[in-house]
Amino acid sequence: VASAQFSTPQRSVRVLDAPGHRDFVPNAIVGASQADAALLVIDGAVGGFEKGFSAAPGGALGQGGGQTREHVQLARCLGITQLAVCITKLDTLGDAGYPGTEAVQERFEAIRQQLEPFLKKAGFRPGAVQWLPASGYTGENLVSRSAASELAWFQGPTVTEAVDTFEAGDRRVELPFRMPVAEVLPKGRELGPAAVAGRVEAGAAMSGTNVRVAPSGRIVKIKKLQACGEPLTLARAGDAAEAGLLGLEEGEVRQGDILCHPNFPVPVVRRLEARVATLDIMVPLLKGREVVVHAHAAAAAGQVAEIRARLDPKTGQVQKERPRCVTRNQAAVLVLDLERPLCLEKYADFRGLGRITIRDGGHTVAVGTVTELLEFE
């Protein structure tokens, strides 16, 4: 996931650019799991939005259609509640035979009318969604607008103004230290041979602090902390940080590991219970189905070991105990067995480490939260 840093009058902002192509949805999951808010970039060119928002015949999301729907659902289910929808490439309408300000405004409103009901269904409150046009080619409405442009009709915020209104998420500094490894950095002079980057989910750490690396259990020392290459004295919950680790060699830490407090280690599990919601899937979830379970920056192959209950999606009440299968747009309680251990927490204890995404064959089939940790490594 590409990363960049910039500042607005109110915020210091870290941008995580998640790829839109369906082959890179796991990368998008890693990015969204670290985010407080999302900027959904929509291709407003003729046919662009329709291609991204379409679904394959039969309604299977992400199976031959675009990725807009899947990315929206993943973002919401990974804890993002704040969203700005940025419609771009409206300046290309003239080249496609639709010149003028009126055509640009009509296209903007048409996209909004189609997308808004889906965002609401996905769980985004209308009041938490901002709508704005912008041009990456001309820079129009990124930080300012020109009265002579085709976007002069728009009276809403610029992209930077929209970002300024986002609120920082809940910073759980009072909990034991937790930092998932989102990226293993190349060997360097400043951070040494074992260097990692990620977002601190809970607690805080300083240079010289001892931490445990899970799942290996190795106790190491933080040699140095940085943020975007600049020295960092203290990394607290919510901060993006790079850490050099003393006591490890290159290759001894990997993406998906977690740095944690030595006396309060993160659970390492092979079996878990999760409350999930299926997406618009074509093939029902059955006991024994092989899947891939994604959590924060980690992923592991696994299997649906049990379907304990099917739930009412609105109330959460049990509709049926031990059903044979779970079909599209249903809620259920599953037990998942993992082929290799993952570092997980119950959602009730650490939200950022208790969300999971279930995928199969390159498609997201369900999303949910960890309710119980059943078998430890």
Give the ranges of each region predicted by the language model:
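Conserved, well-folded catalytic cores of nucleic-acid-processing
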Residues: P9, G31, A35, V41-A45, ...
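Conserved Switch II/interswitch segment of TRAFAC-class P-loop GTPases
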Residues: Q10-R14, A18-F24, S33-E109
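P-loop NTPase nucleotide-binding/switch module
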Residues: V1-R14, A55-P57, G136, P176-M179
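C-terminal effector/interaction modules appended to NTPase cores
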Residues: T8-R11, K187-E377
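Residue-level signature of catalytic and energy-coupling elements of molecular machines
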Residues: D17, A28, L39, A75, ...
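Charged, alpha-helix-enriched surfaces in structured cytosolic catalytic cores
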Residues: V1, Q10, P19-F24, V30-Q34, ...
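Canonical P-loop GTPase G-domain recognition
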Residues: T81, T92-P176, P180-L185
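Short coil/turn segments at secondary-structure boundaries
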Residues: I29, G52-S54, Y98-P99, R145-S146, ...
